[in-house]
Each structure stands twice: as C-alpha cells, then as structure tokens.
Amino acid sequence: AGQASVDVDQAGCYYQVNVREDSEELKALCDTMNRYRNATINYVFGDVKEPLTGETICSWMTGSQGTAVILDQEKVTAFVAGKYDTAGTARTFHTAGGRDVEITGPYGWKLDVAGEVAALTQLIQAGLGEGEQDREPVYAATAASRSLPDWGNTYVEIDLTGQHVYMFQEGNLVWEAPCVTGNIAKNYNTPAGIYSLTYKEMDRILRGAK
C-alpha cells in the first residue's frame, strides 16, 4: 500500500536557501544596484558628452561577489573602444600654399582601452553615487585640441614636394625656409603624414641607414 501522508520537510522536498530576505549583504547589494540604475557617467570629449546610463551599466552585470557586482568585460570593452579616436584617421590639412590635402598618421587622440576598461570597472565596482558625474577617459595619446584640426594652430608644416618648411605659431606664419628631405631614389624617403615632434636639435647631420 502507498503512503497516506508524507512529511515534506523530512523528505527533503524543499531547497535549502543560503540567502534570506533579512540578509544584510543582500540588502547592501540591492542598494548598490539601485544606485547604478539611477546613475549616469558622462564621458567628456571636448564639447561632446557621451552618456553611460545606469540602464547600460546594469545590462553589463553577470552576477555578484559579496556586495560587489561582476561585469561582462567584453561589453565594457565594446562601449569604451575607439570612441572619438583621431589617431590614424584621415583628416584635412590646409597647407601654407592654400591647398587642402588629406593626411593620416599616428598623431591624435587615442584611448587606452585596457586602461580605461580597468578604471571604469573599478569605479563601478567601488559603488557609484546617484545622479550624474563627468569622466575624462584614460588616454594612450593626446592631441593639442579636441576639435578639428586636433593639432591646433601651432605646428610645423613640411612640404615634401616643394622642399620647404613652415612654422606656424597661434595661426601665424613665424618662420619658413627651404629644406631637403629624404632621397626617394635611395629609399631614404621622409614618410608623409602627421606626427608629434620628437625632439629639436641644432646643427644635426642626418644620415640614412648604411
């Protein structure tokens, strides 16, 4: 004959919970997540602000460890990567001769993606306050200006075709001179593009590879 009754407690029919509604740790985690939902981080790129909303932050959460949340690092990286970088992109340069030419090169703004992901993750896990806060990202390289042209109005222009060099300061031509760049026939060509000024030195003889 079958059992007429069963004691569900003794039969082990209930899952044993480790966290209960009066858990202080659970309450603290709930408060933290509510702060995230009501927070906004504004990434500042010059005059432009890129908002990171609490809703987006919450969508990155994959779990928790104690009162700290665990974030999906791939999603954090996807948000951060390449935002408003100018290094390596094509930009228009107005030459001293009055022409507009397109140039590229390593000079410009470039985010340190790994550094910013780590800093942003630490900031979020440390606990955000409610409301808005502005943030400057971690950069691997910076430029003179956030607006284009990002090299500003103080720079040196080298005209490889005309073999002439110009120096502009605050937008004014303050010096110019003829120059000799690398010998293309001997494969000593001077690379075209936009670069940072590495160093300045007088009376230096430049020699190519032997």
Give, region by region, the residue ranges found by the protein language model.
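Surface-exposed, secretory/extracytoplasmic low-complexity segments enriched in Ser/Thr/Asn/Gly/Pro
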Residues: 1-210
